[in-house]
């Protein structure tokens, strides 16, 4: 089993475990041929192009569809990092695991994964996520969908904060950052997690978006 890591400084691991974050976005390397046809598809093409996900192979396929022919010509393939239906261990440093679990697994402060979750064993992790859906779309799609932003972990208050701010996310520098709109909030979150100006510099980039649910693992 493989593991998946979320940003701790911005509270994303905790958001996943609490069920407040049920979607994650990854900037993955796509073949040039695949990205080219994605852009052609976005602009509209006749014969038109279809981008589909095959659950059996775990591959995205772009096919050319001829309006007056039944057959479809396969143009390009892309294999996303995570596959629909599969489970992945949510990485946490050993020191954060429940005391009874640390004792049962005989974990010590000298273990490589005690402070660094990059070195933990997936089988020891008490939580899993199961991938429910895999999608490919440009990053800017988030700017037009409150639902997607909330699934990414953006928090919406029942009532506006002072200055009419209603959306927020945990920040590495500040405890919480507040925003007037969900689009500004998701832009701020991407900049926090992926680096300054990520939203502006990658606004038109195709990304892979994974929707998931969280499950407890019986170690």
Stretch-by-stretch model annotation:
Residues 1-219:
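Secondary-structure transition motif
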């Amino acid at each position: 089993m493989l593991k998946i890591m979320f940003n701790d400084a911005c509270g994303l691991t905790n958001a996943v475990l609490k069920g407040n974050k049920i979607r994650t976005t990854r900037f993955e390397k796509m073949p040039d041929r695949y990205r080219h046809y994605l852009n052609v598809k976005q602009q509209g093409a006749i014969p038109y192009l279809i981008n589909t996900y095959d659950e059996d192979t775990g591959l995205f396929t772009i096919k050319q569809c001829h309006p007056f022919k039944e057959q479809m010509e396969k143009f390009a393939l892309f294999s996303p990092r995570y596959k629909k239906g599969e489970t992945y261990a949510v990485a946490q440093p050993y020191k954060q695991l429940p005391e009874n679990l640390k004792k049962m697994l005989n974990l010590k402060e000298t273990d490589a994964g005690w402070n660094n979750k990059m070195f933990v064993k997936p089988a020891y992790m008490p939580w899993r996520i199961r991938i429910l859906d895999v999608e490919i779309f440009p990053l800017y799609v988030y700017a037009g969908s409150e639902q997607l932003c909330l699934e990414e972990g953006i928090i919406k208050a029942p009532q506006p904060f002072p200055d009419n701010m209603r959306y927020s996310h945990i920040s590495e520098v500040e405890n919480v950052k507040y925003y007037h709109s969900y689009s500004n909030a998701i832009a701020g979150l991407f900049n926090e997690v992926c680096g300054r100006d990520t939203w502006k510099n990658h606004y038109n980039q195709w990304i892979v978006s994974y929707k998931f649910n969280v499950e407890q693992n019986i170690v």
